[in-house]
UniProtKB/Swiss-Prot annotation:
Keywords: Ribonucleoprotein, Ribosomal protein, RNA-binding, rRNA-binding
Cross-referenced PANTHER family: 50S RIBOSOMAL PROTEIN L9 (PTHR21368)
Domain of life of the native organism: Bacteria
GO terms classed as biological process: translation
Name by which UniProt lists this protein: Large ribosomal subunit protein bL9
Protein family (similarity comment): Belongs to the bacterial ribosomal protein bL9 family.
Keyword Ribosomal protein: yes
GO cellular component, one term: ribonucleoprotein complex
Source organism: Flavobacterium psychrophilum (strain ATCC 49511 / DSM 21280 / CIP 103535 / JIP02/86)
Length: 147
């Protein structure tokens, strides 16, 4: 079954992609949730025309995402957390990284930040997906909170 995605679906594709999925997944989940619609021949023609019109706008969006990526790399992120020696009491997740970025002046949704769960102090990297073509590696440091 071929479907046209209306929005980004994790592990499947991006908005306006034509994807092939099993019939049950399409009929019972993607279409009822509003994530996709049937890829008929007329829908494919309309999609092709829309993509042509959107191509030049997309170039500007990619350039803006790259500029934002450069700004993110310039921010030095230090997250302080309670720790006993090297081990943290709790953990640092993408939510904490998003909050640290917001304090640095860049608001990024936590869904676009990919980072493992960190339970020790030290330096780590996280991936930030700003656009389907722009993924930035972000360095951050976890330090023990001073009591």
């Amino acid at each position: 079954m071929e479907l046209i995605l209306k929005q980004d679906v994790q592990n499947l594709g991006f908005k306006d992609d034509i994807v092939s999925v099993k019939a049950g997944y399409g009929r019972n989940y993607l279409i009822p949730q509003g994530f996709a619609h049937m890829a008929t021949s007329s829908a494919k023609k309309v999609l092709a025309e829309n993509l042509k019109q959107r191509a030049h706008k997309e170039a500007k969006v990619v350039a803006d995402a790259k500029t934002l990526g450069d700004a993110l790399k310039a921010i030095e992120i230090k997250i302080s957390a309670k720790a006993g020696g090297e081990k943290l009491f709790g953990s640092i997740t993408n939510i904490d990284i998003a909050e640290a970025l917001a304090k640095g002046g860049q608001s990024i949704d936590r869904k676009f930040i990919t980072s493992g769960i960190v339970k020790r102090t030290g330096k780590y990297n996280a991936s930030v997906r700003l656009h389907r073509d722009v993924i930035v590696e972000l360095a951050y440091e976890i330090v023990a909170e001073q009591a």
